[in-house]
Amino acid sequence: MFAEIQIQDKDRMGTAGKVIKCKAAVLWEQKQPFSIEEIEVAPPKTKEVRIKILATGICRTDDHVIKGTMVSKFPVIVGHEATGIVESIGEGVTTVKPGDKVIPLFLPQCRECNACRNPDGNLCIRSDITGRGVLADGTTRFTCKGKPVHHFMNTSTFTEYTVVDESSVAKIDDAAPPEKVCLIGCGFSTGYGAAVKTGKVKPGSTCVVFGLGGVGLSVIMGCKSAGASRIIGIDLNKDKFEKAMAVGATECISPKDSTKPISEVLSEMTGNNVGYTFEVIGHLETMIDALASCHMNYGTSVVVGVPPSAKMLTYDPMLLFTGRTWKGCVFGGLKSRDDVPKLVTEFLAKKFDLDQLITHVLPFKKISEGFELLNSGQSIRTVLTF
């Protein structure tokens, strides 16, 4: 309510069409800490939307930019998992209006390109997978100290205000709590969708999830929702087992507990009946382990974790020749503008519990503390509020 009143007040002051000054966490270069700066956010141009951010999650992908393992131009405002309210719209915008509660989408859905028109596709041609760091017209809406600041993954949510393309925003139910449903903007949807959309887990099946971070836990929740009868969680850190069991895992194991290959351990545990495996770590070795662990003839293995850049994978092609299916997905294979509002509605109907994934809620000014929690392994998801 407070944020909505604030939007109304700003409308009365006539911010639409004008530059807004606000606080943002700017990364001036890689491997350097965030700097909380006053930035200028330009008005939205044609088919663009300016959003007041209410809450934003800290995701491992953001940390990849800091560490230099993900391509980005600098300076940049990262962050891509958020909830906000539309402050103003550019010419030609028809799907949202000022005052609407929305989720910015790092994976756009233009509904016109081949991927958007294909029922099985979701990697929209407007996706910024190469780290261009600008909007559709090739420019940025952010300025700091007289210098242009780049966008990140079409979203840039570590700021009080951002500007996105209309194809990168989904209107959601106004009753949705922003500090919870922001996770639907990335982490939860990526894992949940990997199970229900990409993997197409069948009722009564056995699933194995490699990696029990926030996305891995979301995969477990998706497997449970799809009706899997057995869900095995795998992680080197046994401290993660309790939470995995709480969200739906039927058992958890650590590879360190056996000298046998993990695929052999799983075969013995299940009577050689693993239907689905999910690699949610991003390590080449575990991608192959996950593939080898599903049934050699009818098993499906899904790569969910972001693989390291500039690395090549070597594997025995017989793993596929016998009939296994090996798949990957971005955003769980979901069509962002279509599926995000549906997931918010399902959350409000208590189909799944996002509280299980949120371990910390901090004010935006403590963003660096949030990343310390991430890198020390103390958090699953930290949400920053404005």
From Swiss-Prot:
<keyword id="KW-0560">Oxidoreductase</keyword>
<dbReference type="InterPro" id="IPR011032">
    <property type="entry name" value="GroES-like_sf"/>
</dbReference>
<dbReference type="GO" id="GO:0001523">
    <property type="term" value="P:retinoid metabolic process"/>
</dbReference>
<feature type="binding site">
    <location>
        <position position="116"/>
    </location>
    <ligand>
        <name>Zn(2+) 2</name>
    </ligand>
</feature>
<dbReference type="GO" id="GO:0045471">
    <property type="term" value="P:response to ethanol"/>
</dbReference>
<dbReference type="GO" id="GO:0004745">
    <property type="term" value="F:all-trans-retinol dehydrogenase (NAD+) activity"/>
</dbReference>
<comment type="subunit">
    <text>Homodimer.</text>
</comment>
<keyword id="KW-0520">NAD</keyword>
<dbReference type="GO" id="GO:0004031">
    <property type="term" value="F:aldehyde oxidase activity"/>
</dbReference>
<keyword id="KW-0479">Metal-binding</keyword>
<dbReference type="GO" id="GO:0035276">
    <property type="term" value="F:ethanol binding"/>
</dbReference>
<dbReference type="InterPro" id="IPR013154">
    <property type="entry name" value="ADH-like_N"/>
</dbReference>
<protein>
    <recommendedName>
        <fullName>All-trans-retinol dehydrogenase [NAD(+)] ADH7</fullName>
        <ecNumber>1.1.1.105</ecNumber>
        <ecNumber>1.1.1.1</ecNumber>
        <ecNumber>1.1.1.66</ecNumber>
    </recommendedName>
</protein>
<dbReference type="GO" id="GO:0010430">
    <property type="term" value="P:fatty acid omega-oxidation"/>
</dbReference>
<dbReference type="GO" id="GO:0042573">
    <property type="term" value="P:retinoic acid metabolic process"/>
</dbReference>
<feature type="binding site">
    <location>
        <position position="80"/>
    </location>
    <ligand>
        <name>Zn(2+) 1</name>
    </ligand>
</feature>
<dbReference type="GO" id="GO:0008270">
    <property type="term" value="F:zinc ion binding"/>
</dbReference>
<feature type="binding site">
    <location>
        <position position="124"/>
    </location>
    <ligand>
        <name>Zn(2+) 2</name>
    </ligand>
</feature>
<dbReference type="GO" id="GO:0009617">
    <property type="term" value="P:response to bacterium"/>
</dbReference>
<feature type="binding site">
    <location>
        <begin position="281"/>
        <end position="283"/>
    </location>
    <ligand>
        <name>NAD(+)</name>
    </ligand>
</feature>
<feature type="binding site">
    <location>
        <position position="113"/>
    </location>
    <ligand>
        <name>Zn(2+) 2</name>
    </ligand>
</feature>
<keyword id="KW-0862">Zinc</keyword>
<dbReference type="GO" id="GO:0005886">
    <property type="term" value="C:plasma membrane"/>
</dbReference>
<dbReference type="InterPro" id="IPR002328">
    <property type="entry name" value="ADH_Zn_CS"/>
</dbReference>
<feature type="binding site">
    <location>
        <begin position="304"/>
        <end position="306"/>
    </location>
    <ligand>
        <name>NAD(+)</name>
    </ligand>
</feature>
<feature type="binding site">
    <location>
        <position position="110"/>
    </location>
    <ligand>
        <name>Zn(2+) 2</name>
    </ligand>
</feature>
<keyword id="KW-0963">Cytoplasm</keyword>
<dbReference type="InterPro" id="IPR013149">
    <property type="entry name" value="ADH-like_C"/>
</dbReference>
<dbReference type="InterPro" id="IPR036291">
    <property type="entry name" value="NAD(P)-bd_dom_sf"/>
</dbReference>
<feature type="binding site">
    <location>
        <begin position="329"/>
        <end position="331"/>
    </location>
    <ligand>
        <name>NAD(+)</name>
    </ligand>
</feature>
<keyword id="KW-0443">Lipid metabolism</keyword>
<dbReference type="Pfam" id="PF08240">
    <property type="entry name" value="ADH_N"/>
</dbReference>
<feature type="binding site">
    <location>
        <position position="240"/>
    </location>
    <ligand>
        <name>NAD(+)</name>
    </ligand>
</feature>
<feature type="binding site">
    <location>
        <position position="235"/>
    </location>
    <ligand>
        <name>NAD(+)</name>
    </ligand>
</feature>
<dbReference type="GO" id="GO:0004022">
    <property type="term" value="F:alcohol dehydrogenase (NAD+) activity"/>
</dbReference>
<comment type="function">
    <text>Catalyzes the NAD-dependent oxidation of all-trans-retinol, alcohol, and omega-hydroxy fatty acids and their derivatives. Oxidizes preferentially all trans-retinol, all-trans-4-hydroxyretinol, 9-cis-retinol, 2-hexenol, and long chain omega-hydroxy fatty acids such as juniperic acid. In vitro can also catalyze the NADH-dependent reduction of all-trans-retinal and aldehydes and their derivatives. Reduces preferentially all trans-retinal, all-trans-4-oxoretinal and hexanal. Catalyzes in the oxidative direction with higher efficiency.</text>
</comment>
<dbReference type="GO" id="GO:0042572">
    <property type="term" value="P:retinol metabolic process"/>
</dbReference>
<dbReference type="GO" id="GO:0005829">
    <property type="term" value="C:cytosol"/>
</dbReference>
<feature type="binding site">
    <location>
        <begin position="60"/>
        <end position="64"/>
    </location>
    <ligand>
        <name>NAD(+)</name>
    </ligand>
</feature>
<feature type="binding site">
    <location>
        <position position="381"/>
    </location>
    <ligand>
        <name>NAD(+)</name>
    </ligand>
</feature>
<feature type="binding site">
    <location>
        <position position="186"/>
    </location>
    <ligand>
        <name>Zn(2+) 1</name>
    </ligand>
</feature>
<comment type="similarity">
    <text>Belongs to the zinc-containing alcohol dehydrogenase family. Class-IV subfamily.</text>
</comment>
